[in-house]
């Protein structure tokens, strides 16, 4: 009886959110609110400028440092989020390359079923732990258990210091791939990108298509003009030039606040909903899941304001990528001492692609992701539309029962099986 009463809030929360969400969503998209949002952000920039001129310090930077230290300490002490054991095989500035293994300290390189490794590229926003939240809700474990040699890019806690442009992230993906190619003695690698990480993977594959065996995208933005989420509306109205001129960093707690502000009710109830989404009816597991999700939600690293500016202006505001007008600096090609500017043409992508779209995604609109397979030149391409939200794709019971087995099966069909001599 107690168990039944304990889990009835799941239905109540869903009903409560549904009945209040529509009106709040309308208000948060209104012209008045968007103008007030822009004015508010500009006032923060102006206030910080006055403080620096008159007092020689930035209260916003000081507050960010305090919040960051407090939450990092809290999260580290609260719960261990990493579930699947891994080794750090190399560190490039602040970026780490993780190599996952099974239940022992011996990596699976010699015993994996599939010879084609998989590199996971998470978004620069938040940390990668949401795709490895718990043993039975881990995307990493799904691939690992199926026999894939799994690697992960961990962008780190201090991205603002060493990743200043989109090019820097693309360069790190390339360096990671080169390291994995040498480690595994494989010419081509499977690539899986999530959210903004998926967008970065699209850019990478347009430049280095020949290095990739297949590409999995999950909730990846492409047609930003069609992204009608609240976050996208705010990005299009964000005074990013003024912010970039004043600050060197896009503070992590600013990003956390944006996720909260987009819909405080949903943001507050979602973590309860995700934690309650269990078929085991285990109160201990509910509390454990809630702690992990809460820790992840408040663990957003600072980004370089220069990178944030480029991503917002070139993609959210100008929509350059889908129109093949985005240009980035190649790290290797130099002309007269200058880095070579390369245009990103998505038609260069010819590899097999699986595009995973959440039909209820409120962070990346499905309309922004669905055009991916229409733009690339790949003949082997598939879209899976799943009745789920952005985070639910990663951790919901339904997704792990009905979505990820399909994804694993698709990747198995694109990967070579290891010979016994390997």
PLM region spans:
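Short, surface-exposed "cap/lid" segments of acyl-processing enzymes
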Residues: 82-84, 88-158
């Amino acid at each position: 009886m107690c168990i039944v009463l304990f889990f009835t809030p799941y239905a109540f929360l869903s009903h409560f959110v549904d009945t209040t969400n529509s009106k709040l969503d309308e208000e948060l998209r209104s012209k008045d609110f968007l103008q007030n949002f822009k004015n508010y952000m500009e006032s923060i920039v102006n206030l910080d400028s006055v403080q620096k001129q008159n007092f020689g310090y930035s209260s916003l930077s000081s507050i960010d440092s305090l919040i960051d230290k407090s939450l990092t300490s809290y999260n580290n002490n609260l719960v261990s989020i990493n579930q699947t054991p891994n080794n750090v095989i190399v560190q490039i500035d602040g970026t780490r390359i993780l190599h996952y293994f099974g239940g022992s300290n011996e990596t699976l390189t010699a015993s994996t079923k599939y010879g084609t490794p998989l590199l996971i590229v998470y978004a620069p926003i938040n940390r990668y732990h949401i795709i490895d939240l718990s043993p039975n809700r881990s995307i990493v474990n799904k691939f690992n258990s199926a026999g894939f040699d799994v690697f992960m890019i961990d962008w780190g806690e201090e991205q603002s210091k060493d990743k200043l442009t989109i090019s820097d992230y693309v360069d790190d993906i390339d360096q990671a791939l080169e390291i994995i190619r040498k480690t595994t003695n494989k010419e081509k690698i499977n690539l899986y990108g999530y959210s903004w990480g998926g967008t970065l993977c699209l850019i990478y594959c347009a430049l280095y298509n020949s290095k990739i065996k297949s590409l999995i995208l999950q909730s990846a933005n492409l047609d930003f003009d069609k992204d009608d989420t609240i976050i996208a509306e705010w990005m299009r109205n964000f005074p990013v030039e003024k912010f970039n001129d004043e600050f060197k960093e896009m503070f992590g707690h600013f990003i956390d606040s944006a996720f909260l502000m987009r819909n405080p009710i949903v943001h507050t109830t979602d973590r309860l909903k995700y934690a309650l989404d269990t078929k085991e009816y285990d109160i201990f597991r509910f509390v454990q899941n809630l702690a992990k999700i809460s820790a992840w939600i408040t663990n957003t690293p600072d980004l370089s304001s220069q990178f944030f500016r480029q991503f917002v202006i070139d993609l959210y505001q100008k929509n350059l990528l889908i129109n093949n007008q985005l240009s980035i600096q190649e790290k290797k090609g130099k002309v007269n001492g200058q880095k070579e500017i390369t245009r990103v043409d998505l038609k260069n992508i010819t590899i097999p692609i699986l595009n995973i779209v959440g039909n209820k995604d409120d962070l990346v609109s499905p309309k922004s992701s669905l055009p991916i397979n229409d733009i690339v030149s790949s003949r082997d391409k598939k879209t899976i539309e799943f009745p789920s939200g952005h985070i639910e794709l990663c951790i919901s019971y339904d997704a792990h029962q009905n979505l990820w087995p399909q994804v694993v099966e698709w990747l198995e069909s694109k990967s070579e099986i290891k010979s016994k001599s390997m």
